[in-house]
C-alpha cells in the first residue's frame, strides 16, 4: 500500500464527516431504514431518497453512488452488507465485496477521502471482530497499488467497535 494512504478508526457521527464519500450500510431497496442508513437519509434530506428510488435497489455485496445532498460529504456510496447466518453462507466474501465495490466507485469518481461505517454489524448481526478484520484486510489489498485514495476512515458507532477496529489496525 502506498505510504501516503492513511487508514484509521474514529468514533463519530458519519453524517458529520467532511470527506469526499461516506459509505452507507443500506438495505437492498436503498430507500432508508434504521441505524446508519436512516441517519444518512435524514441528514442528506429528501433528494437522497429520490436519487435512491431512481437506482432501483442494490444487490448484497454490490454498491451504488449518489450525491451527498445536504451532507458535508460530496458522495454517498450505498452498499448492502450480508446478514450474518453463522458464517458458512458466503458472508465473508459478500462483506469483502461491499468494501471492494465501494472503493471502486470512490476511485472512479476521483474521491481521495472515504469513510466507512462498520458494515453489517448492527441489525444484520455480523460479529464486529470478524467484520473489522475483513474490512481492514480488503481495504489494504484494494489500495496496495492505488494512488488515488489518500485517507480511509472507519467510523465507529460505539467505544467497543472503535477498540476492535483500532486493535485490528494495529495488528495488521
Swiss-Prot record:
CDD domains per record: Macro_OAADPr_deacetylase
Entries under Pfam families matching the protein: Macro
Entries under PROSITE patterns matching the protein: MACRO
Signal peptide location: none
InterPro entries listed in its UniProt record: Macro_dom, Macro_dom-like
Gene3D superfamilies: Leucine Aminopeptidase, subunit E, domain 1
Domain Macro: 1-172
Source domain of life: Bacteria
Protein family membership: Belongs to the MacroD-type family.
Name this polypeptide is given: Macro domain-containing protein CT2219
Amino acid at each position: 500500500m502506498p505510504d501516503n494512504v492513511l487508514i484509521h478508526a474514529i468514533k463519530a457521527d458519519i453524517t458529520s464527516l467532511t470527506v469526499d464519500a461516506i459509505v452507507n450500510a443500506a438495505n437492498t431497496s436503498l430507500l432508508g431504514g434504521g441505524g446508519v442508513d436512516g441517519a444518512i437519509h435524514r441528514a442528506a434530506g429528501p433528494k437522497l431518497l429520490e436519487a435512491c428510488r431512481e437506482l432501483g435497489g442494490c444487490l448484497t455485496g454490490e454498491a451504488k453512488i449518489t450525491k451527498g445532498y445536504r451532507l458535508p460529504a460530496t458522495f454517498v456510496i450505498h452498499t448492502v452488507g450480508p446478514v450474518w447466518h453463522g458464517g458458512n453462507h458466503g458472508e465473508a466474501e459478500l462483506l469483502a465485496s461491499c468494501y471492494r465495490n465501494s472503493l471502486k466507485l470512490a476511485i472512479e469518481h476521483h474521491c481521495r477521502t472515504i469513510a466507512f461505517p462498520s458494515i453489517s454489524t448492527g441489525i444484520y448481526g455480523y460479529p464486529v471482530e470478524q467484520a473489522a478484520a475483513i474490512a481492514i484486510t480488503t481495504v489494504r489489498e484494494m489500495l496496495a497499488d492505488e494512488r488515488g485514495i489518500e485517507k480511509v476512515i472507519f467510523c465507529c458507532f460505539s467505544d467497543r467497535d472503535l477498540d476492535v477496529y483500532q486493535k485490528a489496525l494495529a495488528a495488521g
